[in-house]
């Protein structure tokens, strides 16, 4: 058996053709879905990049492994304590180690560990390659040569795992200009109207309609050609959507190249392929554009398409974590699932073509805001401890995802019973997880004690000035009232 894991960064589930998207963004992934398993309701337990992949590789939620942020103490694995063995639990029981210790040849082509200082990602990979000499954001045409060379060298061997990380949908949108815009004549999704743009224009927060490039339009210099300075008109909104969707199509082209290579080597029938992501991306949801700042539907709902030789094609609608997909792959390969993992195998469900899944999921964000959410039935309950300077985010929010997938109508006040149900599920889950952890301290509390999420630290005083300069003084006043201790620390 062979396994190719194509890890496409920042790929939200509903922008795939096989998920019903109106643009032809993913013809190659769609082909895999038709012949494999399309999981329709997979969510990253922890977002964004570093927390998500750390949860995936360790098999543990961020509240247990300790990684919920992009900087500070909660951006490193939690110490195992005095009973740490010569070979740490994290190393011995990582997803890649499970294959490596079973005799598989394991390899990863990714700049992610270097970008985030996440050396633990490499635990269990015999070959951990940043062949692009990158720091994240490499285009597929920079990643593919190393992947194709590896497949030429190892592809016909048995029992290998190759992880290939593609960044193209991640902001900034840098698909080569000569690639053009396949979606120039395609309209925006129906849901994003001028009414929504106008509402978002008056909101606050990094990567908002007036600052889709950070806390200021020029925070990172001039935006690339595929991204506008702001969302001041529907033309600019379309440019943002197009830049993202072109990145998806460019990554999908790379998927096609890799599939063709497997065909050329004559190993397609004996190679499993998993296509998934670390997190999604918001395009107006909760006022955020072209980033991943909440524990919400847009950010946490990710695609998962699995082609496994001998497994019947099917659509699975169960509610799953990305950890469940990782665990299922290990089970399908006939390997032992580490006892401490939080993931749940779906092997029996896939064999019987039943959905399976969980009653509810807990979703966490600690790098741009401090939030945990509960996804159950048709509902998403969100609890916010740090708003990431999005002044309109309430402490409690509730959305009907079936009727309102883009989170436009907060029902928390009108549906107190459902909000209380979500709150109770979250409180019980938190207590259960901390009881199983190496430490009784919630890493989210560590983030708050350090002054808040990494990506917003140090920005508040200058951002309050910008809000006042751009006619949004009311949000500046709200943020001043909410964050007095942060202002005292940063001024």
Mark where each language-model region is.
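Catalytic domains that recognize anionic headgroups
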Residues: 1-491
């Amino acid at each position: 058996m062979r396994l190719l894991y194509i890890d496409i960064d920042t790929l939200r589930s509903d922008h795939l053709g096989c998920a019903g998207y109106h643009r032809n963004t993913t013809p190659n992934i769609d082909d895999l879905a038709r012949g494999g398993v399309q999981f329709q309701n997979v969510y990253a337990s922890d977002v964004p990049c570093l927390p998500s992949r750390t949860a995936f590789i360790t098999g543990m939620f961020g509240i247990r492994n300790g990684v919920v942020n992009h900087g500070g103490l909660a951006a490193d694995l939690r110490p195992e304590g005095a009973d740490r063995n010569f070979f740490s639990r994290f190393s011995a029981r990582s997803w890649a180690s499970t294959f490596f210790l079973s005799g598989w040849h394991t390899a990863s082509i990714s700049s992610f560990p270097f970008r985030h200082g996440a050396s633990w990602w490499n635990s269990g990979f015999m070959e951990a390659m940043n062949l692009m000499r990158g720091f994240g954001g490499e285009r597929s045409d920079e990643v593919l040569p190393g992947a194709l060379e590896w497949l030429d060298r190892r592809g016909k061997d048995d029992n290998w795992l190759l992880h290939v990380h593609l960044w193209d949908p991640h902001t900034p949108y840098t698909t080569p200009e000569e690639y053009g815009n396949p979606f120039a004549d395609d309209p925006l999704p129906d849901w994003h109207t001028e009414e929504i743009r106008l509402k978002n224009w008056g909101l606050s927060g990094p990567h908002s309609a007036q600052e889709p490039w950070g806390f200021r339009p020029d925070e990172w210099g001039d935006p690339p050609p595929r991204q506008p300075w702001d969302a001041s008109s529907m033309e600019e909104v379309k440019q943002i959507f197009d830049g993202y969707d072109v990145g998806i199509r460019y990554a999908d082209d790379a998927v096609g190249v890799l599939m063709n290579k497997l065909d050329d080597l004559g190993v397609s029938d004996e190679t499993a392929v998993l296509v998934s992501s670390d997190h999604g991306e918001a395009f107006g949801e909760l006022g955020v554009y072209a980033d991943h700042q909440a524990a919400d539907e847009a950010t946490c709902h990710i695609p998962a398409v699995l082609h496994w030789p001998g497994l019947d094609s099917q659509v699975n609608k169960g509610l799953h974590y990305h950890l469940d997909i990782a665990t299922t792959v290990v089970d399908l390969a006939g390997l032992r699932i580490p006892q401490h993992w939080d993931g749940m195998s779906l092997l029996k469900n896939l064999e019987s073509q039943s959905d399976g899944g969980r009653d509810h999921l807990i979703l966490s964000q600690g790098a741009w805001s401090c939030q945990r959410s509960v996804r159950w039935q048709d509902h998403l309950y969100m609890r916010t401890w740090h708003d990431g300077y999005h002044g309109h985010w309430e402490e409690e929010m509730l959305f009907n995802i079936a009727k309102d997938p883009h989170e436009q109508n907060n029902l928390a006040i009108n549906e107190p019973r459902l909000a209380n149900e979500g709150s109770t599920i979250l409180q019980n889950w938190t207590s259960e997880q901390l009881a199983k952890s190496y430490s009784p301290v919630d890493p989210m509390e560590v983030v708050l004690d350090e002054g808040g999420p990494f990506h917003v630290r140090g920005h508040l005083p200058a951002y309050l000035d910008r809000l006042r300069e751009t006619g949004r003084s009311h949000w500046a006043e709200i943020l001043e009232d909410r964050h007095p201790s942060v202002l005292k620390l940063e001024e």
